[in-house]
């Protein structure tokens, strides 16, 4: 057995070795390359298919194989690779060859010299076949790019050690694949030839010569195929002659760019060659070995060695080098007399300025650019890497530099030492490698002998060990100090920061601190005012000048002496004003990436400031300080030589491209081609305003005035409404190759990115509403009509309204679409705009001067004919009023006479103001009532647009509107007159009718008398004949009533059907058959009743004689009984029964159908579900309706709430009959239970305490309820059942954060999930022993507030606590499996027993939150939760889902307010609270104001605790997406207030109106020195101001940290306000007094403070104001008045006070009156791309908070040392040393800061002795490495009850370490190349720590 296993193991290892061997891999990759079938296979197929003899076939295959062999060899052999891989050679070879081949195939007998049969090898055609196959095989990868498979061999060659073996095996693999392919092809061809069915095809038989023709034209077919493939491939990479060549940047291009250009050329040409050569170590000489001459480091002082070396080499060597370089890069050396320059350069060595030569070279290069195309060499014509052939984006950088080349490789391969081994690095600096080569050439090889690899290894290992031991020592020392219980923050390693001022303890702002990295690193903003420049910038300048001085010593300059004097003045005396001014000027350039100054720019600046400073001095100063201007004054610029930044040069395009729009608007800078290259969206620049400043001076030329006019134009850009297929494509690039705008249909109207295809709405066929179909059927068939009536009527009503609105919207959309289509059609058809323009103008003239006057004349003549007074004056007045205003194509008004610019090309609209409407008469008494209507109409339609056919349209290209008819009022008048005539006529008729009626009445009365008498006679006859039946009749009556009662009873007793069937049925029949059905029912019923009564009376007499039927006993009874007894009667009874059955069959059928329906249908569609659905829908719709109408009253709210309750009750009543529990969703049960009040839960006690399987609640749900604390504590089990579900899911389930609505999930950003987990940690972060020491703590905090120096430490500690919490959470969630000791896996309520008791005893009976509120509302509002608004954006809103309110109001709110855990249960809550809430309920408004003046506000703070936020708006005005809130409208105000700016509102202000009496006196004291700088706090705040405002926003989270004492709260807000005032002052350089009014200042402050708000008008704004704005806009010729007004207010262009009638309205009053509405902008505005990126990649809060340790001295967070433990989460089970005050660090590494932490981890992993080579990855193989970690925590005290338990100590990876580090480790250190191993990496990065 052992022997077998041994054999098996050997076999497996052998197999593995074979599989991993180079030969097998080579065979595999070679075989794969067979599948990349390129056009080269066409020739092979041609030779096989065309039967031209075996010789040709053989020659074709041999040619094919040799070609492939050459390709494989070229991969390995560098010279061959260069020959075939050089694009120039292939281009030169391929194009003529293809052309020649094409002609040769077309003219068959072109090369027939007569075949010599002696030796077939000499036959030219056979040789050609061989050559064709050979050459085409070589082309395959270059001019005709094939698929990726062909390149696999090249790629794998890099990783392989024995390369020759790999190449040969690869070729063999390809050969095998090729043989298989050829054999298969041969089989297919033989099958085609032999297949009878193909030959016997009808079509082939009818065309006898078809096969022959095919065979003859086979060559032609193949040549066509070849041509198509060539065209296809050239389509993918276009031929260089056909594509458009972009113009280079202008002649005066900066030298930097030209250098870069050369760089790129050198890189592209040399890259392929260089890499292979270096790897193989081939000794071939480099054709141009020093690209460093033209590389980025160029001629820096550091590179003197290189230049020296070149000088030593002498003239010849340099000539060769330069010559080779220029030929390489494609510049014709014959046109460039380089040698002379070189001679002069070498002869003038003593001058020592090598830049001269470089400049001359550049000039020559630019000259070359100017040459005509035929003067340029062929290669550079055919192949130019600068062509923009692929559709890349052109991403503009800034005005100094060109766009970055994305497709250029930025890698440079070379060998270097890494981890003690020689490895290939792809980011090796090219200059270094070339420098190394030069040294190798100069120094003898013996001295450069490599050391042995072992030496290297050993050295590296030893250094690494040394470093890691040092680190370990330091780490252990820190831990030991911690263990000695002397905790201080010095143990923690913190980040060093730059300090601005030691005395004031100010740091340099984060943004500018070079020692900090992260999102704060940024460029310093440009500032132009001289006052801002402080000492530091002067210091920088001095330093800069010193460096330049050093530079001039190295490169002596003629201006040196002057320069030195100038420097002395700079050093000795303060800068003169001119220099100071100049600095501000330079500043702008200084902050751009280092580049050159432009002389023209300077002259521009000097022109502007000519009055103050002499421009000559300035330019001199530039000359000396920056050495930037040539002494000769030429425009060729030099590089700014300043402090060299460590940066990598990026390959850039040599073009500066501009878009069409830029060309049209003239926004581009100088030195840019005038023609556009980027195709932007179809647009037209419409000039709407030109200010012609006519110049009276006769001396000025026309050109100047033209320029002036150009600058004074105001233009809009009008985009076409068509889909934009251009998307910024560059001219000459291939549109079909774009990735993101794919065209996948034959005809595609809109362009879509494939990413968003799912968003496109599917066709209507596939989407239909099933429930919508079922509902009406159910309603029509069920007998429940009565119950649905209320709901149905409302639902129908809302549906009808919705449908109307939908239809209206749809109609509007359709019209709009049609309008746009028409406009686009006019725009696209050539010459359409010209035709339309002329037509419009002719129509306008016709209308104004021909049609309307003629109509007026006709009308008035008609009036005169009808003997009416003519109305000439009125009509002419109206006609004069009509104005025809010329507008742009967009509809922007110009004037009556002024035509828009280029109107024939761009289009024109003609707007008719006060369009003339012909009326039959003007003022009449008849129309006095309609006067108002007409006025309204007039106001509405006082303008229209003229259409091409002379009609009027509401909008440009709209459908023509209906004009009021001229004859309509005339006809109406006629109708009225006819009506009057009719009235008179009818009066006469009435008189006649009255007389006729009298006659009729007399005749009727006589008739009646006759009938009565006849009836009387008949009656008498009947009475005499029949006496007995009368008694029976009486019986019948009584019986009938009894029977109906019975029937009714039976119906009532039936619970399922509440109404008689007949009634239901009749209700649903159509109207036509209604009367018939009723009649039928009636007759049926009466007859059955008769029969039944007869039957019952007789039967019962017979069978049961003892029962009396009637109360009156008749003497005839016995006779009757006798009658029944006879047999004849029995037969009659049977007969009657049959008839009765027949009669009853109708009802039986009905009943049966109903039964069927009830059993089948109702079991499927159960009533409770539908009831609830209807209920929810109807309430939602009702609420929607209220929202839309904007009418809300308290009554209505109450009404809704009552409806809610009543409807719920109804649904409960109805549903209990058909209660099928399986159809009730868990969510529904949960929802209902959560809605019920606490008291009602006692009814469910039995259900909840029922321990077996419960019917109503699933066990999961039950447990969930317990977790949430919905039940009373009595109902909770002491021990929960252990879950047997996956524990992780379980853990998630217990945290409410994961129970989110769809809307919430959609809003989540990448970080939000993490934040939710973090919040859950905070939820448990309370120790409740301190509950009663609340007030005492508050006082302590308050006292300690005054001396802030002590609290920098506590501030740090506070930060550290946060870090601790996150660590704890991470630790807990990972250790979830260990259930007994983990804290989070237990319920918070179990641990916090105190909380339960205290909350039950201290809060009121109606506890609104139940147990839940105690925890979760505080989770949102307590200390330390809202840490940084930047991080926790999702904390901006309350999560109302976790609060289950009841529908009560006052008491519940009181309870709610009280149940805040941090608040003292003894705190007094004043009556104000209720007043405010009532106010909100009654009026539906927020009464909230901004602090007008902080001083006044202190006094009134008690009253307007809800007011200071400045929101004033109707509740329903705000669109709230989530309709959940409308189920509880009472709480919307709270939500809205909090939503505005939660990180500013203290948590108490939101819910509590605190008692302020105790603190009033202190506040008064504070008030007095509020604006004095003596107050330390304010000092601190002012210090904070020095950090930028955005930073302030980030850090303002600290404001919410107050414990509830109103004193600090208020002062803090005053400080904040103060800060904002000062901020705005410093920013604008203004004082407060400069504001014209309070309103303006307030608005300014508001917009500054609440950056997330935008202003919006209310629609009902003052009419006069709108008109003024319209006038204002008409002057500017703009469209939308309200938008412009708002923007102008925000920009301070328009004053608020001018617009308002009342003076000095405050902002709140403005909002109260509804003039201004302030809307919150959604938070997404805040997150720019960089921030979101940082969210995903960056360091987490743990990290960040620790690095801010020393950052803000004056941060106002105070922690009492005694309460230090309070904030650390240490439950009783997990408390370690309850009496100690230090932290037990969960993650000991946190002592070190991040970079050192990383180093420690990595070093401890480098167990270097096990590393045998690059391919071996021992980190994952060797578990022993992990044990190194046990030493860190060897002597720690036990954290748990059981000792020696393993802590799985893992960090969350993403927050703590940056992605780049991870990727680097992943890729190079641990030798994994994809992301799939990240998980392995995680495990090994965070190993276990053992505790002894």
Swiss-Prot record:
Disulfide bonds: none annotated. It comes from Nicotiana tomentosiformis. It is found in: Plastid, Chloroplast inner membrane. Part of the Tic complex. One of its GO terms (biological process) is protein transport. The keyword Transmembrane helix applies. This is Protein TIC 214. PANTHER family: PROTEIN TIC 214-RELATED (PTHR33163), TRANSLOCON AT THE INNER ENVELOPE MEMBRANE OF CHLOROPLASTS 214 (PTHR33163:SF47). Pfam families: Ycf1. Its main location: plastid. Keywords: Chloroplast, Membrane, Plastid, Plastid inner membrane, Protein transport, Transmembrane, Transmembrane helix, Transport. It comes from the Eukaryota.
């Amino acid at each position: 057995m052992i022997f077998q296993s041994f054999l098996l193991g050997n076999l497996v290892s052998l197999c593995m070795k074979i599989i991993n061997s180079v030969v097998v891999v080579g065979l595999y990759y070679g075989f794969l390359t067979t599948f990349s079938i390129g056009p080269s296979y066409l020739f092979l197929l041609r030779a096989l298919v065309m039967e031209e003899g075996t010789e040709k076939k053989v020659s074709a295959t041999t040619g094919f194989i040799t070609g492939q062999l050459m390709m494989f060899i070229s991969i390995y052999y560098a010279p061959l690779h260069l020959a075939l891989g050089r694009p120039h050679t292939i281009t030169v070879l391929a194009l003529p060859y293809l052309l020649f081949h094409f002609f040769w195939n077309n003219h068959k007998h072109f090369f027939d010299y007569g075949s010599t049969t002696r030796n077939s090898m000499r036959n030219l055609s056979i040789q050609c076949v061989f050559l064709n196959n050979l050459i085409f095989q070589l082309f395959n990868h270059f001019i005709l790019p094939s698929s990726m498979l062909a390149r696999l061999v090249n790629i794998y060659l890099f990783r392989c050690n024995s390369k020759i073996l790999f190449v040969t095996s690869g070729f063999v693999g390809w050969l095998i694949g090729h043989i298989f392919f050829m054999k298969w092809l041969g089989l297919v061809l033989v099958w085609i030839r032999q297949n009878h069915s193909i030959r016997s095809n009808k079509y082939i038989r009818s065309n006898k010569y078809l096969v022959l023709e095919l065979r003859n034209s086979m060559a032609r077919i193949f040549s066509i195929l070849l041509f198509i493939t060539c065209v296809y491939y050239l389509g993918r990479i276009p031929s260089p002659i056909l594509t458009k060549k972009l113009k280079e940047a202008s002649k005066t291009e900066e030298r930097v760019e030209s250098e870069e250009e050369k760089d790129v050329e050198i890189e592209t040409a040399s890259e392929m060659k260089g890499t292979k050569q270096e790897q193989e170590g081939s000794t071939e000489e480099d054709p141009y070995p020093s690209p460093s001459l033209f590389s980025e480091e160029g001629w820096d002082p550091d590179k003197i060695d290189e230049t020296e070396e070149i000088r030593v080499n002498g003239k010849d060597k340099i000539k060769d080098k330069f010559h080779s370089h220029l030929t390489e890069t494609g510049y014709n050396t014959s046109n460039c007399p380089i040698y002379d320059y070189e001679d002069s350069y070498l002869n003038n060595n003593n001058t020592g300025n090598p830049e001269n030569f470089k400049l001359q070279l550049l000039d020559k290069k630019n000259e070359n650019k100017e040459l005509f195309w035929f003067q340029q060499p062929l290669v550079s014509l055919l192949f130019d890497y600068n062509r923009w052939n692929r559709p890349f984006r052109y991403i503009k950088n800034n005005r100094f530099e060109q766009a970055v080349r994305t497709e250029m490789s930025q890698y440079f391969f070379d060998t270097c030492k890494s981890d003690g081994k020689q490895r290939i690095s792809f980011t090796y600096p090219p200059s270094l490698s070339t420098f190394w080569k030069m040294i190798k050439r100069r120094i003898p090889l013996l001295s450069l002998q490599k050391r042995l690899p072992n030496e290297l290894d050993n050295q590296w290992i030893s250094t690494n060990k040394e470093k890691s031991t040092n680190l370990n020592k330091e780490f252990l020392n820190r831990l030991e100090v911690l263990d000695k219980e002397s905790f201080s923050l010095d143990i923690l390693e913190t980040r060093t920061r730059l300090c601005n001022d030691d005395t004031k303890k100010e740091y340099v702002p984060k943004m500018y601190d070079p020692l900090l990295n992260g999102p704060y690193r940024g460029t310093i903003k440009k500032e132009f005012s001289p006052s801002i420049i402080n000492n530091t910038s002067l210091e920088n300048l001095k330093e800069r000048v010193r460096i330049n001085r050093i530079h001039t010593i190295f490169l002596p300059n003629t201006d040196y002496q002057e320069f030195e004097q100038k420097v002395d003045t700079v050093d000795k005396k303060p800068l003169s004003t001119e220099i100071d001014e100049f600095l501000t000027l330079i500043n702008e350039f200084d902050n751009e990436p280092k580049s050159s100054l432009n002389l023209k720019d300077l002259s521009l600046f000097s022109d502007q400031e000519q009055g103050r400073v002499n421009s000559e001095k300035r330019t001199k100063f530039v000359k000396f300080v920056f050495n930037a201007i040539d002494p000769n004054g030429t425009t060729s610029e030099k590089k700014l030589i300043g402090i060299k930044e460590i940066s990598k040069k990026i390959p850039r395009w040599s073009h500066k491209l501009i878009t069409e729009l830029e060309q049209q608007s003239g926004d581009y800078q100088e030195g840019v081609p005038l023609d556009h290259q980027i195709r932007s969206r179809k647009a037209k620049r419409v000039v709407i305003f030109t200010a012609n400043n006519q110049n009276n001076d006769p001396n000025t030329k026309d050109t100047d005035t033209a320029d002036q006019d150009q600058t004074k134009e105001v233009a809009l850009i009008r985009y076409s409404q068509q889909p934009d297929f251009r998307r910024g494509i560059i001219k000459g690039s291939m549109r079909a190759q774009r990735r993101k705008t794919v065209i996948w249909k034959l005809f595609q109207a809109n362009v879509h990115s494939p990413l968003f295809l799912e968003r496109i709405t599917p066709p209507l066929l596939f989407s239909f509403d099933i429930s919508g179909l079922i509902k009406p059927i159910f309603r029509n068939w069920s007998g429940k009509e009565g119950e649905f009536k209320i709901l149905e009527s409302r639902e129908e009503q809302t549906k009808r309204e919705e449908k109307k609105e939908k239809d209206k919207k749809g109609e509007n959309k359709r019209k709009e679409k049609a309008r746009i289509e028409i406009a686009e059609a006019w725009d696209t058809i050539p010459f359409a705009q010209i035709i339309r323009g002329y037509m419009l103008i002719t129509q306008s003239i016709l209308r104004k001067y021909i049609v309307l006057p003629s109509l007026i004349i006709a009308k008035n003549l008609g009036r005169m004919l009808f003997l009416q007074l003519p109305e000439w004056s009125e009509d002419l007045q109206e006609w004069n009023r009509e104005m025809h205003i010329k507008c742009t194509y967009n509809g922007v008004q110009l004037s009556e006479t002024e035509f828009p610019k280029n109107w024939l090309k761009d289009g024109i609209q003609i707007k008719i103001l006060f369009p003339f409407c012909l009326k039959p008469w003007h003022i009449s008494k008849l129309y006095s009532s309609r006067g108002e209507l007409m006025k309204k109409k007039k106001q509405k339609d006082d303008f229209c647009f003229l259409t091409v056919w002379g009609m009027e349209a509401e909008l440009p290209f709209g459908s023509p509107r209906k004009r009021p008819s001229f004859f309509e009022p005339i006809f109406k008048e006629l109708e009225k007159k006819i009506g009057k005539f009719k009235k008179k006529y009818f009066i006469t008729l009435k008189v006649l009718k009255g007389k006729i009626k009298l006659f009729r009445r007399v005749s009727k009365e006589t008739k009646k008398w006759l009938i009565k008498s006849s009836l009387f006679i008949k009656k008498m006859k009947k009475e005499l004949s029949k006496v007995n039946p009368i008694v029976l009749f009486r019986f019948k009556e009584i019986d009938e009533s009894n029977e109906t009662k019975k029937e009714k009873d039976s119906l009532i007793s039936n619970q399922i059907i509440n109404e008689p069937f007949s009634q239901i049925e009749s209700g649903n029949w159509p109207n036509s058959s209604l009367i018939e059905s009723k009649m039928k029912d009636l007759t049926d019923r009466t007859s059955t009743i008769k029969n039944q009564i007869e039957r019952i009376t007789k039967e019962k007499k017979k069978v049961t004689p003892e029962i009396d039927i009637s109360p009156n006993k008749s003497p005839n009874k016995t006779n009757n009984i006798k009658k029944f007894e006879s047999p004849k009667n029995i037969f009659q009874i049977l007969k009657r029964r049959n008839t009765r059955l027949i009669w009853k069959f109708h009802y039986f059928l009905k009943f049966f159908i109903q039964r069927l329906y009830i059993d089948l249908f109702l079991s499927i569609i159960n009533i409770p579900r539908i009831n609830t659905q209807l209920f929810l829908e109807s309430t939602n719709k009702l609420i929607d309706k209220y929202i839309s109408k904007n009418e809300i009253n308290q009554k209505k709210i109450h009404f809704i709430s009552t409806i809610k309750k009543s409807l719920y009750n109804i649904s409960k009543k109805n549903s209990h009959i058909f209660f099928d529990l399986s159809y009730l969703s868990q969510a529904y049960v949960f929802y209902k239970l959560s809605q019920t009040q606490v008291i009602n839960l006692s009814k469910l006690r039995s259900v909840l305490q029922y321990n077996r399987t419960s019917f109503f609640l699933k066990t999961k749900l039950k447990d969930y309820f317990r977790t949430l604390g919905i039940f009373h504590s009595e109902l909770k089990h002491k021990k929960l059942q252990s879950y047997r579900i996956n524990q992780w899911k379980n853990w998630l389930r217990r945290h409410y954060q994961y129970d989110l609505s769809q809307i919430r999930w959609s809003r989540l950003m990448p970080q939000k999930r993490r934040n939710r987990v973090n919040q859950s940690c905070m939820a448990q972060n309370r120790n409740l022993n301190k509950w009663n020491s609340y007030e005492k703590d508050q006082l302590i905090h308050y006292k300690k507030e005054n001396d802030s120096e002590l609290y920098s430490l506590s501030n740090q500690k506070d930060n550290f606590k946060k870090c601790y919490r996150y660590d704890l959470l991470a630790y807990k969630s990972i250790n979830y499996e260990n259930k007994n000791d983990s804290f989070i896996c237990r319920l918070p309520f179990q641990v916090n027993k105190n909380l339960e008791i205290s909350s039950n005893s201290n809060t009121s009976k109606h506890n609104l939150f139940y147990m839940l509120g105690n925890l979760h509302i505080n989770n949102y509002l307590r200390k330390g939760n809202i840490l940084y608004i930047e991080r926790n954006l999702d904390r901006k809103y309350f999560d109302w889902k976790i609060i289950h309110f009841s529908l009560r109001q006052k008491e519940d709110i009181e309870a709610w307010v009280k149940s805040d855990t941090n608040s003292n249960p003894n705190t007094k809550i004043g009556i104000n609270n209720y007043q405010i809430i009532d106010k909100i309920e009654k009026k539906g408004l927020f009464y909230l104001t901004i602090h007008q003046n902080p001083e006044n506000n202190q006094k009134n703070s008690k009253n307007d605790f809800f007011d200071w936020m400045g929101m004033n708006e109707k509740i329903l005005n705000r669109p709230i997406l989530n309709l959940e809130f409308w189920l509880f409208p009472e709480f919307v105000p709270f939500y809205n207030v909090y939503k505005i700016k939660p990180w500013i509102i203290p948590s108490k202000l939101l819910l509590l109106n605190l008692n302020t009496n105790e603190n009033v006196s202190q506040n008064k004291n504070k008030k007095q020195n509020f604006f004095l700088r003596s107050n330390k706090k304010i000092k601190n705040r002012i210090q904070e101001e020095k950090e930028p405002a955005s930073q302030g926003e980030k850090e303002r989270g600290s404001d919410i940290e107050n414990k509830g004492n109103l004193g600090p709260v208020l002062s803090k807000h005053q400080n904040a306000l103060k800060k904002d005032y000062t901020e705005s002052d410093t920013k604008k350089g203004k004082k407060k007094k400069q504001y014209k009014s309070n309103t303006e200042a307030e608005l300014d402050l508001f917009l500054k403070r609440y950056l997330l708000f935008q202003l919006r008008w209310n629609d009902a704004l003052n009419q006069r104001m709108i008109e003024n704005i319209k006038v204002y806009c008409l002057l500017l010729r703009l469209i939308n008045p309200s938008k412009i007004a708002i923007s102008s207010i925000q920009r301070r262009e328009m004053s608020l006070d001018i617009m308002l009638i009342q003076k000095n309205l405050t902002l709140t009053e403005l909002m109260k009156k509804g003039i201004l509405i302030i809307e919150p902008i959604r938070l997404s505005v805040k997150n720019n791309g960089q921030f979101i990126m940082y969210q995903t990649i960056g360091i987490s809060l743990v990290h960040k908070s620790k690095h801010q340790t020393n950052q803000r001295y004056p941060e106002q967070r105070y922690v009492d040392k005694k309460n230090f433990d309070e904030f650390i989460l240490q439950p009783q089970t997990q408390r370690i040393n309850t009496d100690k005050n230090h932290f037990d660090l969960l993650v000991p590494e946190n002592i070190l800061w991040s970079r050192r932490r990383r180093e420690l981890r990595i070093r401890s992993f480098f167990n270097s002795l096990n590393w045998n080579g690059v391919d071996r990855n021992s980190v994952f193989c060797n578990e022993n490495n992990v044990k190194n970690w046990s030493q860190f925590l060897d002597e720690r005290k036990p954290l748990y009850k059981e000792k020696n338990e393993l802590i799985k100590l893992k960090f969350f990876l993403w927050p703590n370490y940056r992605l780049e580090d991870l990727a680097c480790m992943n890729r190079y250190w641990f030798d994994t190349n994809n992301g799939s191993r990240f998980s392995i990496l995680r495990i090994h990065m965070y190993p276990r720590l053992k505790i002894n």
